[in-house]
Amino acid sequence: MNAPASSPARRTKKLPPLRVGIGGPVGSGKTTLLEMLCKAMRDTYDLVAITNDIYTKEDQRLLTVAGALPEERIMGVETGGCPHTAIREDASINLEAVDRMLSRFPDADIVFIESGGDNLAATFSPELSDLTIYVIDVAGGEKIPRKGGPGITKSDLLVINKTDLAPLVGANLDVMASDTKKMRGERPYVMTNLKALDGVADVIAFIEKKGLLTV
């Protein structure tokens, strides 16, 4: 595995760091999405990442082993309690982590913040995240989009992951797409198979467009 460069290519126009929150249930593919985004964007943008786990720093370890970013650019946060509390009701532990990473890497273009696995009601505090991406997976059943909840209805981008599993779990992707449109209105969504990189480019395009990132 080739280690990523410690000093990525720089943008010609400097903008304030964009904070991108990635949330979703346990096992939906949040860490995989973060890994794919880091690997695809690290040569263009200066990236740092913060992961949340309740009692461990497992996601930080996984990203480091995968070579998503240099080890010093990934920070693990142990929340010690409900994951949604650390990203919304009392986001102080993550706000402090963001400040620490930006003090180390003041030229960072994007700060990714991955929440711990949580339910459909989890949302990011606007003080912590500029853009929110919520990840669900097909294996949870085709009914998930119509269950609603802030993660489904209010996130800036909904990612419906593991589309390759639809035939195995009896999920109809057309039904999921229809229900998603009903629940989200004009808010965008992307269907992905992250292991095959399907849909990753669409997520990146969304981040660049909505985050006003120009190279």
Curated annotation (Swiss-Prot):
The keyword NAD does not apply. GO terms for cellular component: cytoplasm. Facilitates the functional incorporation of the urease nickel metallocenter. This process requires GTP hydrolysis, probably effectuated by UreG. GO terms for molecular function: GTP binding; GTPase activity; nickel cation binding. Residues 1-21 are annotated as: Disordered. It comes from the Bacteria. Gene3D superfamilies: P-loop containing nucleotide triphosphate hydrolases. Transmembrane segments: none annotated. This is Urease accessory protein UreG. It comes from Burkholderia vietnamiensis (strain G4 / LMG 22486). Keywords: Chaperone, Cytoplasm, GTP-binding, Nickel insertion, Nucleotide-binding. It is found in: Cytoplasm. Belongs to the SIMIBI class G3E GTPase family. UreG subfamily. Signal peptide: none annotated. The gene is ureG. Homodimer. UreD, UreF and UreG form a complex that acts as a GTP-hydrolysis-dependent molecular chaperone, activating the urease apoprotein by helping to assemble the nickel containing metallocenter of UreC. The UreE protein probably delivers the nickel. Coiled coil: none annotated. Its main location: cytoplasm. HAMAP family: UreG (MF_01389). GO terms for biological process: urea catabolic process. GTP binds at G24, P25, V26, G27, S28, G29, K30, T31.
